[in-house]
């Protein structure tokens, strides 16, 4: 089956051998600059030429997303915007948040870094996304492949780096306002940004919010725990979402010292469809009076972070960088109190609180950069992190725990011959975790009443065992970038990375209605270890440009969630999903191209294919992304931009054991119109996008709702207005 789709990719590629986004659209994560502060203080426009040069000097595949790209693909969901890149998918969670997947790797294998602070919002599994402001993501780097050298073990699969906004050229007050609305949720949002630059002082404030109603869907029913559940009026009851975000940043821009302080708050309140949460009950899905109310069951998320950084130019060759951060990630899931055991009593306080996960993190980083006279750059860095987690609620999924990690790294980047650049490094990490025990007396009574054996009672006496684990490992990489001539570029990167297992992989044990399953961790799991080899071949001239990026990753110990086929002993839970490890292979290819048909016409094509293989089972790994292909034609006369896009999403029949396939090929059409104008001293932009014009019904194999047979959203009109001054 997939041979056909590989052929489709090749057939699209053959007539466009020279198509792809120009090299200027990519940027390395650590640029080689002769002056340590040029990289930080220059604006995106000033650095347009240097971005192309820097890209040619890095062996990794890196995407640079500027304001033009982010505005064109804005959806109100940052992870969904990233999924427009080849090789990047998204697990959509509600209307505002999602979880990015890069080359088939997701969850805690992808690090999101905001101004040097790694966000910890993905700690708890599939229904927990990136709590970030979708309006405040300019500029962004996406590093495909292992980024563990710079960002630690959680960057095994890739890194998303949000850089601080560029400092304006002019002194004084500046700002922008953005508002958006969409038809699929009959909701919208807005964001206000104000900044002030006076001498060396720069302060910037942004406040954002979104308000969405129940989602329109193309289905009239779902299947949950083998039960048929109706969806009335094609509207998913209680799926409304509210998000808010604010950030305050202060910078001191001195001659030799640059310092910054930043504080931010991100939050969400999102309802769960009652027909797929808890014990099935058809009465709970009857229509209510409002599509905007959020009733039980629902979840709330709040992420608070503060961070400070200091850059000191000691000499023309030396620069010291220090960063310190604190964050709290608080998630609460509320559901009308229900018990799976007859002896359990209603709690006196917070009776409807099913789960509360409260994770606090302190992190620090020290870095020394040496800019050699011949143009190379050495970086010696050390970082550490300490976390402590507390749980509450009448349900159990994860225990209390404490976790500490630290690492030291040495990297080099520089030219070794004419047109040939080397990037290499080594990193050593240590990790420690202490897990607290948890005993559920109501479960013990329930099992005794059922007459279970003493062995079963002993097995289930503790939902979580007390234990400590320690890890240490080495990671490294070497990459070459060869600028063959002014038209051709070749890159290759070989690396070894590892990842410490997450708490849910070690100690999860409970019914998680948010993910529709009973998850069980394994405290004996070792760290993930993998070897990565990727390459990139590119061609560009004034008329054509093309990039082809094959990759392969082999894991000697890959941790994944496997449907076991075992029926859980807990009531109303379905089969058990167990975390286990295996040898695994991820390989695939990405292609991207652009043909400048005319000064006002462009044709763009991109596609990706990911192949996963479980060596032990000789099957695919769970949640493998389907092949995708898209192409669009864009007309951009003065002030206007009109784009028509055709997207193809392949079915997914390569599945893990006990995983459902996703049949059918999705063929989607999108249309976007943008007008850029000027009003007095202010610039404005009006964009109207029509997504899924034909209102096609299709399933996404990566979707959070795929397990209950809920199709993706139908036709959606998205209006965005931006005013900057």
Where are the model-predicted features located?
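Outer membrane beta-barrel strand-and-loop segments of large Gram-negative receptors
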Residues: 351-367, 407, 520-526, 532, ...
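Periplasmic-side early beta-strands and strand-to-turn transitions of outer-membrane beta-barrels
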Residues: 171, 175-178, 195-298
């Amino acid at each position: 089956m997939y041979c056909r789709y590989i052929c489709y990719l090749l057939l699209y590629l053959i007539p466009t051998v020279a198509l792809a986004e120009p090299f200027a659209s990519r940027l390395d994560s650590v640029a080689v600059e002769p002056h340590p502060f040029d990289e930080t203080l220059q604006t995106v426009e000033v650095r347009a030429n240097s971005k192309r040069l820097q890209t040619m000097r890095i062996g990794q595949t890196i995407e640079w997303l500027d304001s033009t790209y982010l505005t064109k693909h804005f959806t109100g969901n940052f992870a969904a915007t990233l999924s427009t890149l080849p090789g990047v998918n998204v697990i959509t969670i509600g209307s505002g948040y999602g979880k990015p997947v890069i080359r088939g790797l997701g969850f805690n294998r992808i690090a999101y870094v905001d101004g040097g602070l790694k966000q910890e919002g993905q700690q708890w599994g599939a229904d927990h996304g990136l709590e970030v402001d979708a309006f405040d993501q300019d500029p962004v780097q996406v590093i495909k492949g292992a980024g563990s050298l710079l960002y630690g073990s959680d960057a095994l699969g890739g890194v998303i780096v949000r850089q601080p906004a560029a400092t304006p050229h002019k002194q004084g007050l500046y700002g922008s306002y953005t508002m958006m609305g969409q038809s699929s949720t009959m909701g919208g949002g807005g964001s206000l940004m104000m900044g002030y630059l006076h001498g060396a002082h720069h302060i910037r404030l942004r406040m954002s919010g979104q308000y969405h109603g129940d989602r329109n869907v193309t289905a009239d029913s779902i299947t949950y725990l083998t039960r048929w559940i109706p969806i009335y009026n094609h509207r998913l009851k209680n799926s409304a979402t509210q998000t808010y975000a604010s950030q305050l940043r202060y910078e001191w821009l001195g001659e030799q010292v640059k310092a910054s302080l930043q504080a931010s708050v991100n939050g969400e309140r999102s309802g769960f469809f009652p027909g797929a949460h808890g014990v099935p009950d058809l009465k709970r899905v009857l229509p209510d009076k409002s599509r905007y109310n959020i009733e039980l069951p629902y979840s709330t998320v709040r992420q608070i972070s503060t961070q400070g950084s200091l850059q000191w130019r000691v000499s023309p060759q030396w620069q010291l960088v220090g960063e310190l951060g604190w964050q709290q990630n608080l998630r609460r899931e509320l559901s009308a109190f229900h018990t799976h055991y007859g002896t359990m009593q209603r709690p006196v306080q917070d009776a409807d609180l099913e789960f509360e996960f409260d994770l606090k993190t302190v992190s620090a980083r020290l870095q020394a950069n040496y800019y050699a006279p011949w143009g190379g750059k050495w970086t010696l860095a050390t970082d550490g992190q300490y976390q402590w987690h507390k749980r509450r609620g009448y349900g159990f999924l994860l225990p209390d725990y404490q976790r500490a990690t630290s690492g030291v790294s040495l990297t080099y980047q520089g030219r070794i011959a004419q047109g040939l650049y080397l990037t290499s490094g080594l990193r050593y990490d240590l990790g420690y975790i202490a897990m607290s025990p948890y005993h559920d007396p109501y479960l013990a009574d329930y099992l005794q009443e059922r007459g279970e054996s003493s062995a079963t009672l002993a097995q289930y006496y503790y939902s979580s065992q007390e234990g400590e684990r320690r890890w240490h490992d080495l990671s490294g990489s070497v990459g070459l970038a060869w600028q063959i001539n002014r038209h051709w570029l070749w890159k290759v990167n070989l690396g070894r990375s590892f990842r410490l297992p997450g708490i849910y992989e070690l100690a999860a044990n409970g019914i998680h209605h948010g993910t529709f399953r009973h998850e069980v961790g394994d405290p004996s799991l070792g760290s993930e270890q993998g070897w990565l080899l990727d390459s990139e071949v590119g061609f560009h001239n004034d008329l054509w440009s093309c990039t082809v990026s094959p990759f392969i990753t082999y894991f000697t110990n890959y941790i994944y969630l496997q449907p076991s086929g075992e029926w859980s002993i807990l009531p109303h839970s379905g089969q058990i999903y167990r975390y286990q490890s295996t040898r695994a292979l991820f390989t695939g290819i990405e292609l991207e191209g652009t043909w400048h048909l005319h000064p006002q016409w462009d044709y763009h094509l991109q596609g990706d294919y990911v192949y996963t293989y479980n060596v032990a089972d000789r099957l695919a790994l769970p949640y493998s992304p389907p092949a995708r292909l898209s192409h669009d034609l864009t007309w951009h006369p003065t002030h206007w931009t009109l784009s028509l896009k055709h997207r193809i999403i392949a079915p997914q029949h390569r599945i893990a054991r006990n995983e459902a396939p996703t049949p059918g090929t999705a063929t989607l059409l999108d249309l976007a119109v943008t007008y850029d104008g000027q009003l007095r001293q202010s610039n404005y932009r009006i964009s109207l996008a029509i997504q899924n014009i034909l209102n096609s019904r299709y399933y996404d194999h990566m979707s959070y709702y795929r397990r209950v047979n809920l199709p993706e959203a139908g036709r959606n009109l998205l209006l965005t207005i931006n005013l900057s001054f």
